[in-house]
Structure formats: structure tokens, C-alpha cells
Amino acid sequence: MSNILVNIKGIGSQEFSKGVTPLQIMTDTKGVSRDSITCKVDGVLTDLSAQLLKDCDLQFMDAKSKDGHSVLLHSTAHLMAQAVKRLFPKTKVTIGPYLDNRFYYDFDVETPFSEEDLAKIEAEMVKISNENLEIIHEVKSRDEALSFFDKIEEDYKVEIINDLDKDEILKVYSQGEFTDLCRGPHVPSTGIIKHFKLLSSSAAYWRADENNQTLQRVYGTSFQNEKDLKKYLNMLEEQKKRDHRKIGKELDLYFFDDEVGPGLPLWTPNGAVMIDELEALAKEKETASGYLRVKTPHLTKGELYEKSGHLKHYISSMYPAMDVDGIDYYMKAMNCPHHHKIFANTPKS
């Protein structure tokens, strides 16, 4: 078998047999971190189990890197889905992406998950992690994937595949008895996923459409070590203490009313005092820094915004025009044109 030249970032170029995997290189090459969970081949995020068939650049990454952490999070979503299927076999799986420091998976379940259910799911995830199941990826044609997921009655996967081009080549990932449709990449085995926590569950609509089936969305997080996990969970606890929704209710600052509209707070006397104090502080800081305040109308002729160019770019996100004596007026969406008018009102040297 012929050899290929692999340029390993931080180490240099070395020859390997054609078909070698990054995982084999990681195991056999001095200087490559054993904490690596994924890699980039010629800049493309790739499974450690992928075969290298030509000369390439290779970069290994652990879960502390942004790309590595995204792979760990996504792999943990699959781990959770497998645990859910073991505990609740009638569940239908949908999608499970990663977010910033978190992941979620949407499930079609008979009854919403309780706190006790989440604890059971997390415990089952620990068991699957301890089983250290190899995570294997396969490439399937559209028809092969359709046949497979139709046979195991995963209707949402069938719907996703049906929406793809007929010539689409698909990847599936398997760990033990669980197989999911996914672009990947993933960690090499479930045993790598050790430090995770399920955070919450809530309702969600399939494909974010309220006319579709209501699903159960479970959020979680996952890190390379226990220290980073605890640090993140502590940060979440601190955020909860400072949540404006919690503080606003506890201090009786404001509330919302459906007849007024979403995102339009009604400030109570306590809230009004807070606003006055914040405005006074802002004025004090601005004055100390040499700024002068002006005030401009809340309504403006559309002509001004047309002249400034704002109307052309922002009309879709502005309140509709109000017809006053045959002239279009708009709620003020930006200050710049008015400030230009004030500046131009007096001669400047």
C-alpha cells in the first residue's frame, strides 16, 4: 500500500500508510494530545475514525477548543437520545443540535418529561458512557436511509430525508443499538463523554411551526472535565439570581399585559423610581464627560428618513406609516437624522 504525507499541526510532516485514521495517528505519534476528540483535515472538521487517502494537513483538537467542544456537545445529544429510547421505547426522535455551551434534543413523547424522568435519563446516560460503545459512521444513499428509518418507524427522520435532494449522500452514526441521521462529526466512543448535566425540558413545535406536533425539548451541557462543568453550572446559578424576569417580579418593578402587547412593560411606581435613578446616573456621567443632551420628536415625516437613506434599509422593521393630512409620518426609529438637523441649525466655524 502506498504512503501519504500528513502535515500534523505543531509536529510536522510524517509519512503514513494510505487509509490510516487520525485516531491511529493520535495513538502512535508522540506529541499528539491523548485528549483529542476530533480533528480537522485540510481545514474540515472530521471524525477521528475517517480514513486519510491523500496528502493532507491534520489538526487535532480537544474539547477545550470551540470546534472540539461543539463535537462533544453534539455527541452528548446523541447519548441522551439513546438513553431516552432505552427508557421510553415509544419515543420518536427528531433533531438534536448543539448551541453555545449547550445542546438540546426534541422528542415526540406520549407525556412530557418530569424532573424524575430527567434524572433517570441522566443516570442511563452514565450507564451508556460506561459501556464505552464505539461510535461508527456510515454513508448511505437516500433510498437506503429512507428504508432504514422507515423500518424502525422513525417518522421524523423519514420526513427530513424526503425533503432532501434525491442524489443526496447521507451519513448515519451508530452506537450500540442506537442509530441517528447526522452530518457529524462525533467523538470516537461514548466512554469519552463523562462530564454532563441535563438542565431543563420544555415544549417546542416540530420545525418551529405551531401547526405541527408539540415536542418535548430537553437541554443539557457537557464538558471535557468536571471542573469546567461545575464552573458552567455555577455561572448558570448566578445568572438565575440576576434574571430580570425574576428580579422584576420580586421587586415589583414592571409587568406585562396581553392587551398591551409583548415586550411592552408597564412600569410600577417602584419601576419608575428605578428608571429615574438610572436616567439621573446617565445624565451625571454624560455631563462629566462633556456631552450635551438634546431632545427630538417621537414622530417624523417619512421624507427625512428617505433623505437619510434609513427608510430604504429599515422600513421592514419600523412601525407602519401614519397618514397625517396626506403626509406619511413614522415613529422615530433612529436619532441620527434629527441630530444632523440640530447640528446644521447653527453656523459652525
Language model segments and positions:
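Ubiquitin-like/PB1-type beta-grasp interaction modules and other compact soluble beta-rich domains
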Residues: 1-101, 120-127
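Auxiliary tRNA-acceptor-end handling modules of aminoacyl-tRNA synthetases
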Residues: 50-71, 92-96, 104-349
